[in-house]
Swiss-Prot record:
Major enzyme class: oxidoreductase
Pathway the protein contributes to: Secondary metabolite biosynthesis
Carbohydrate-modified residues: 92, 147, 159, 170, 231
Protein name, per record: FAD-dependent monooxygenase nscC
Keyword Hydrolase in record: no
Name of the gene encoding the protein in the UniProt record: nscC
Organism, as annotated: Arthroderma gypseum (strain ATCC MYA-4604 / CBS 118893)
Amino acid sequence: MAKQQRTVLIIGAGIAGLTTSRLLTNNGIPNIVFEASTPDRSQGFAISLQEFGYSTLLSALGDLPLSSLIKGVAPDRVIGGTGWIDQALRDNRTGELLVAPELTTTKQTVVRANRNALRQWIADCGDEELDVRYGHKLQRVEGKAGNITAVFENKAKYNGSLIIAADGVNSTVRSQVLPSVVPETIPLIHYHGEFQLSRTKFDELIRPYSGHSNILVGVGDRFNTPLSICNMSKSHVHLDWSYSRTVKEGNDLLYRPNLPSEEAKKIPLALVEELGALDLAGPWKHFLNPESLKSHRVFHWTTRCVYMTQDDARSAGEKGIVFVGDSWHAMPIFGGEGGNHALLDGVELSNAIVTAMASTEKDYWSKAVASYYSSAWKRSQEAVRRSTQRFFLLHRPAADWREIAEKKRRTT
């Protein structure tokens, strides 16, 4: 019983942090989640959950049915939708269907999930409420495995057995214990816009192209313009768009990595002019244009990835620090697998901790960390490389897309 009095300190209330907390709590292991932001923090955009991610989570939560997840997180859940996506790619200058995966099974293998709803659903999957403390921005960590302290900017201090760094791509924990591991900036332009439509307008402008899919992906000549449903009700639809492309040679006015947060919310004139010159087809032309931008919330996103060597991960583990989520395997959002691996991290780490604490060994925290990294390191780091490669492939020249479409037609 003495082991179970130890508290695990989790830094970050994102998908990885909450998954770990929920599973530890369900297994009777005390833990506290610390989040720098306030409870009203919003990340309402949608992500794609793949079968390898959601099935592992559902199993860990007690073999919950997929329908439970869908009813809780699908962007179109309110109207009876399932978060389905067609995984098709269309030419955003003609509307022509370029790539459409052949459906070999009726089973839904990808579920679109509203990020806010997913965090809440995970937090609610247990009898005991999670202990999440907002407004706690980490300042530093002290100590070692088994006796480690987290010190916060609000002067609060908490002692625990282990610190789980779930604090994202710009991890404060990582920057302190592994200062040489820094995010790598991907040379791509990425702007993200949020807007709302009435159901009538949505059915008129987007539904003819998207059908029941929760995302409509448009690809062009080295640039992409996906439209995605974030939340849908009977009367309104909250959507977002992305505009991403490769960096141009010379002085690219839109390539501005490391912008301050307030500056990233401003719409540069160069973006307005560029979108106005794209000559997009419907429905993209209705939203990615200079006039529409005036009523949209627009953000500049810097695309980063994080790689971590196994030696670095183990070194931090010896100090009582273990990483989950984007803090050690950040990858591109579009075409990436980050959310899925965040779920796997939470499941695998909690399993390792539960198993180690049930053993009679003295150095059980180190055993738990070593067990977790024995499989999670290779899995996650390979995913970063795979996702980054896929991100560039999705920004290929228009001629390549046409060639792919033509080959597809010949073989069908």
